[in-house]
Amino acid sequence: GYVNFSSSAEARSEMDWLLGIELTRYASIKAHQFIRIGRCVCPIVAHIVEREKAIKDFVPKPYSAVSSKEETNGETIELTSKRTFEEGHEAEAQALADAFNKAGATVTSVKTERKTVNPGKLFSMSDLQSFACKADKTLSPADVLAATQTLYEGGYVTYPRTNSSYLATNEVVKVDAAIKGLAQNGITGLINKPKSKSIYDDSKIEAHSAITPTGKWPGTLSDAQKTVYECILNRFCAVFCEEDCTVDRTTIVIHCYDEDFTLKGDVQVTPGWRKFEKPSSGDKMLPKLNKGDAININFQLVGKMTTPPKRYTVESLNNWMVAPMRGAEKEDAEYSDEEWKEILSDATICTEATRADTVDRCVKSQYISLKKGVYYGEPAGFQLVEIMDKLGIVLDVPVTVNLSKQL
């Protein structure tokens, strides 16, 4: 076993020397300027530059939507048809709006179910970086890693460089101690859940378990450390909250002409873990409606423009690096590292320990920039991609993922 680890480390070192140092020298000589080439740097920069090109080349096109926004029983109900109309088809859009208004709208179904809402999983480093950078857009992934490392060295949180969202079954005692330590500092309402497979699962841990507070209460912290610690603490409290979070989940179906419109909303019954960590989006309030109720409508044409692709955020770039082969349409999906790992095993850009530092190198090399949590392609990044293309250097996602799997 140890021989294989040693051989893997040696191969990785030699591969990084070949791709990093030798190709950097080669590209720099050919380009007559310093060009940083890296096994993971290049696909990251290329990915962001490709998105930047798509945004710059995007030509917005006008189209029409058909929407109604009227008040019923004291609440505004907004209905928008699934159908849209390209420029020049306004007459068809108006005909649909007229048909909707003539037909009237009626509630055909109201279903309410009491649901238990589960909190998010404990944090891996990538999940923590995504969450913390969304909470404080001045932070970069490297800032989050550095803050977590300092908290770890101070004994306030567990080891940071982990790709797991689970705890080992032999860590039950450690969690008991953390809960006890937090209770001494006024945080109550927590209970250990040793039989929960969504928390304790040895099969989900490769080397290190999820990041958790130790129970040791920190003193003076920097702003970054405070933000990161609160993220870790609140998620831990949410996961081990004794009270369930329950909601009445209502689904209302409204029929108008030839289309069904579905409204969904939650009404909180017991806050549970939401006392510690607010949900990512606010509850949508729905009016009190019964089957057969008439809905006030006034469908009209709404002129809109198609929008360009979104730039990568810290979260969406992290999601992409964890599973870069899964397809762009899934980049914003809220899956944990563990869930992506099951979908596409080992197909990653960088490791959990190196991901933040690699992106930080891209920023310091001025290939990309990070502004308020959003990544931008910079002129040097465009130049890097162009030079690699001219020199026939192929370090795209499939090549990089294949190298990572072999190493």
Predicted regions and their residues:
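Short, exposed interaction patches on small structured surface elements
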Residues: D389-K390
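Non-catalytic DNA-recognition/assembly elements of restriction-modification systems
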Residues: D396-L407
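Toprim catalytic domain recognition across nucleic-acid enzymes
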Residues: G1-E339, I343-Y367, K372-Y375, P379-E386
